Amino acid sequence: MAKERSAIATIKGYYYQFDYFILQLLKCNNETDSICIEGIEDVDLKTVDESTAIQCKYYAGTEYNHSVIAQPLRYMLDHYLSKANNGIKYKIYGYYKSGQDKLILPINIEFFKSNFISLKAFKGLSIEDKQIISFLSNLEIDIAAREFEQQETDIFNEL
C-alpha cells in the first residue's frame, strides 16, 4: 500500500510540474519568450530580460526540511559554477504540507553552507565564498507555492 501511495504522490508531482509549465506558457507576454520543460531544470523560462531555471516540487504529504531542497540546490550551484557569468537565474518552487517557517529568507552564505552543502561536497567543489554569494544573488526560493488545486484554478483563470 505504501508503494501505491508513493507512486500516486510522484505522479501528482509530475502533473504539478506540467501544470506549472502550462501556467508559465499562458503568462508569456512576448512572442519571443520561450519555455522548455526538462531543460536545465524542470521548467526553464527565457524572456528578453532574463533566463530562469526552475525546479518544481510538490510534497503535499511532507513537512518542509532543508534536506528536501538541498540536492536540487547543489545541482543548481554546480550548473552555475560550470557556466560562470551565464546570466541564468535559479528558482526552487515548491509546495509542502507544513514547515515553511523553518526557512527564513533571504538566506546568507553561512546558512547556505551549513544547511545545503555537505562538508564533503563543499570540499570537493573548491568554491570560494564570493562564488556562493554570487549564486545566492541569482537564486529565488519559494517553498510556499500554490497547492495543486489552486494552481489548476490559476490555469483556468488564465484561459
Describe the predicted segments one by one.
Residues 1-8, 59-159:
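Acidic metal-coordinating catalytic centers involved in nucleic-acid phosphodiester chemistry
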Residues 7-11, 15-78:
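Catalytic centers of nucleases
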